[in-house]
Design a protein with these regions (language model features):
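N-terminal core-entry segment
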Residues: 1-168, 173
């Protein structure tokens, strides 16, 4: 995808008031349920828990209670992404690049866990936006073919959507 002003295109997309269809929301809810299942299943094994927590958060058997002890949104995102990725192999197959939806949902968990004023609808919308941005970028360009890590699209999509939920001005959001 050769596109000038991609930052403006993405920020304009994120500032539009889009009402997602029931089909979009259902697909996102199913993706979220799959993610929760992956997290729970991975938490029953010692290796993924040790890796996800870096051995710092004890032996709590409920993976969703562990995050009470994690202070950073980034660490919460890492924790959930690792546990999900342990079982999630749902890479995209239509794009020129593969992607891991679990990484986007991990970021959403990290952001929304620390922003209790947000609601489930905003959480689901953020996941859809992350998927759409990442998917559109991956449809046109393969970073791996150019020698870059495909995770850049994950980070870009997750980062810009998280920033879009802040109270910063549009020019400030674009500069972040």
């Amino acid at each position: 995808m050769v596109q000038q002003n991609i930052d403006k295109i993405i920020s304009n997309y994120l500032t539009k008031n889009i009402v997602f269809s029931e089909e979009n929301l259902l697909a996102t809810k199913l993706s979220l349920l799959d993610t929760l299942g992956c997290i729970y299943n991975a938490s029953t094994y010692e290796d993924p828990m040790r890796f996800a927590t870096r051995g710092e958060y004890g032996s709590n058997t409920n993976p969703f209670l562990v995050i009470k002890d994690i202070q950073s949104s980034t660490e919460i995102a890492r924790y959930f992404s690792i546990l999900t990725r342990w079982f999630d192999y749902n890479d995209t197959f239509l794009a020129k690049e593969w992607a891991h939806p679990s990484d986007n949902i991990g970021t959403a968990f990290g952001y929304f866990f620390n922003h209790k004023d947000k609601n489930l609808s905003e959480f689901l919308q953020s996941i859809i936006q992350m998927y759409e941005i990442q998917g559109c970028l991956a449809l046109g360009t393969s970073l791996n073919e150019k020698g870059y890590d495909h995770v850049f699209y994950v980070k870009l999509a997750s980062g810009v959507v998280s920033v879009s939920y802040t109270h910063l001005t549009l020019p400030t959001k674009r500069s972040v």
